[in-house]
């Protein structure tokens, strides 16, 4: 089976975004928004060439070939995050006990879930904002992974345990993530 001598991925940089590569650290800026990420893997080189970010590996092994594509996706997500941002939409659903969802500090507080006495909490990751508009919760930010993790934390906080989920459908559910309707 022939093996490629060079795996190379190039990422275009939009005009309103600047990218700096310092060794294995990639810094993406657009206005006041800045994302930094350490992308280090043996045998993979990240560099700037002709206003493009180049991720390459010479005589790669299977895992290095996979990581070149992974790093390309990470850098593309960083560029999209600082230029457009990411947004997840969640909906609040309840049958009998109305839930009250509030955002305070770096936690989301869910009161009266299934009539429970004590509130449930969900951690909000750094750099992520949460807005509650009636029955809708909007999670937004520049880092795709942090926005997704925050939305997952909120959804997991209202997970029903020990009951039939076909009957007890109360909870907060992700309905749209990064522009894709689920």
From Swiss-Prot:
GO biological process, one term: cytoplasmic translation
UniProt key word Ribosomal protein: yes
Keyword annotations: Ribonucleoprotein, Ribosomal protein, RNA-binding, rRNA-binding
Keyword Ribosomal protein recorded: yes
TM stretches of this protein: none
Single Gene Ontology MF annotation: rRNA binding
Gene3D superfamilies: Ribosomal protein L6, alpha-beta domain
Function: This protein binds to the 23S rRNA, and is important in its secondary structure. It is located near the subunit interface in the base of the L7/L12 stalk, and near the tRNA binding site of the peptidyltransferase center.
Family designation: Belongs to the universal ribosomal protein uL6 family.
Assembly and binders: Part of the 50S ribosomal subunit.
Protein name: Large ribosomal subunit protein uL6
